[in-house]
Amino acid sequence: MSISLLQQERHRYLPKVPDLLRGDFRRVCARRGLSTTAVADYDALRSLFARTYGQPLVNFVNASEKNEDSPMETAPEPRGLRVAIVLSGGQAPGGHNVIAGLFDGLKRWHADSVLIGFLGGPAGVLSGDHIEICADRVDAYRNTGGFDLIGSGRTKIESESQFAAAAQTVTRMALDALVVVGGDDSNTNAALLAEHFVNSGISTKVIGVPKTIDGDLKNEAIETSFGFDTATKTYSELIGNIARDACSARKYWHFIKLMGRSASHIALECALKTQPNVCLISEEVAAQSLTLAQIVQSLCDTIATRAQHGEHFGIVLVPEGLIEFIPEMKALITELNEVMARRAQEFEALDTPDAQRVWIEQALSASARAVFNALPAEISTQLLADRDPHGNVQVSRIDTERLLILQVTERLAQMKQEGTYTGVFSSIAHFFGYEGRCAFPSNFDADYCYTLGLTACLLAVHRFTGYVASVRNLTSSVAEWAVGGVPLTMLMNMERRHGSQKPVIKKALVDLEGMPFRVFSRRRASWALKTSYVYPGAVQYYGPPAVCDEPSVTIRLERPAPAANSSFGHRSS
């Protein structure tokens, strides 16, 4: 197979790891902290996870760090372990380094250890479709993007027959542990599997690894999910390139939609990196109950003011999930989903788009109908055409950036007639998503993911189940990073999914009181009127650490001065 010169060089990159993980794993001890609860719905979750709820936080420490008030558990006698890994959900840069870290950790623990990769995501767990990951295989994928070593998938393990199939697979393969690499839904699956295995007397432990470029799987113990750093650096390069083009041509407004359906972390991080004229934050729209008309008017005011200064160009960042945070649009989508769930067969029986449109207008309430009819035809058609297997609107397929362009164009024409706008408006729409999911991981993600793999190995060695690997102190030097495990139930609450209450890991949305948003909100008025673009350039892998190794702006603002010892949840000495 032919590979690029960069890939050849990246194969040689040796990820930096915390000092704790450099030595003999037999010298690494587990220190249990305080028992945990959940985000909310404690009683319901305690009932559903009777065997794994309330487990303590875990910190891994050197055997020399003795503390009588917080005793340590030494590592068991080394033996060969059989561990499997599955990649679940969408791709994120660094997944192959999680596999590499887990593989290297297992071989360091005992030469007879075996790492197995389930193929095609959770479906591979159900079918037993797998490969053994040997040194040659993993070496060919070190520090590379993508999940193509074993593939990924979006199958959810949720029915009784699926749990039984998973149990049969891990039992037949005599697995000591199953490592699930995924986002909130995938790690929710991991928690359910861990509980099921314990209840069934199956010894296989289940361990999660936090993955999502969206950045919405985090809390005090999980400082960031892997892939966010690389993806936002990749998008920011593209935004910077477009901003430079806009500043050169001086005649286009670029509306750029960015991945992030549930949270606006990607848009916010890219805004902090590139300083666009406008960046919409979905969480702020919801908090202020801003209507579509208000958002459009705000955009038009910025465009008109810049035009007065001869600047008929600009950059607007739009989070992918914005449309679901606009109150009247959220109500419309909710009603559409309910109507389609109840009367899907009636809708599907109609043989023309016009007939479907008339039918849906009659089925909607008066308020929802008014919103639906006010939308541009191409957008309302998308609401009806793009639906998931449950009949729900697929929000990610709605061209929100096009919706804004169409509405802004219409409103600016009205403002011209009113005499409040005298400029020229030309627009271009973009969507950046897949461009960032499989990039070569940044040095930060390469180091972080490799460390996550080593940490998952330690959790398997020490026989923990129902935990997600945690690496902290991420704004310190890598040598000072701290590692451990967080009970998955600690991240959970109950939410309504497809008509019933389900246990799920709660998504971390943009905190409007947090430092990243506060810094953004202080500066955005200036960026709106004064062209202040920053051009980050491509992700750098070689050169000064300030250029190559810096983590995201978000995490640096959230955690500017980590404590020297950030062990969490354990009894103080």
Curated annotation (Swiss-Prot):
The record marks K211 as: Important for catalytic activity. Its cofactor is Mg(2+). Disulfide bonds: none annotated. Its EC number is 2.7.1.90. Substrate binds at T212, I213, D214, K251, Y252, M259, G260, R261, E320, Y434, E435, G436, R437. The record marks D185 as: Important for catalytic activity and substrate specificity. It catalyses: beta-D-fructose 6-phosphate + diphosphate = beta-D-fructose 1,6-bisphosphate + phosphate + H(+). GO terms for biological process: fructose 6-phosphate metabolic process; response to glucose. GO terms for cellular component: cytosol. Pathway: Carbohydrate degradation; glycolysis; D-glyceraldehyde 3-phosphate and glycerone phosphate from D-glucose: step 3/4. It is found in: Cytoplasm. Signal peptide: none annotated. Optimum pH is 8.0 for both the forward and reverse reactions. Non-allosteric. The active site is at D214. Homodimer. This is Pyrophosphate--fructose 6-phosphate 1-phosphotransferase. It comes from Treponema pallidum (strain Nichols).
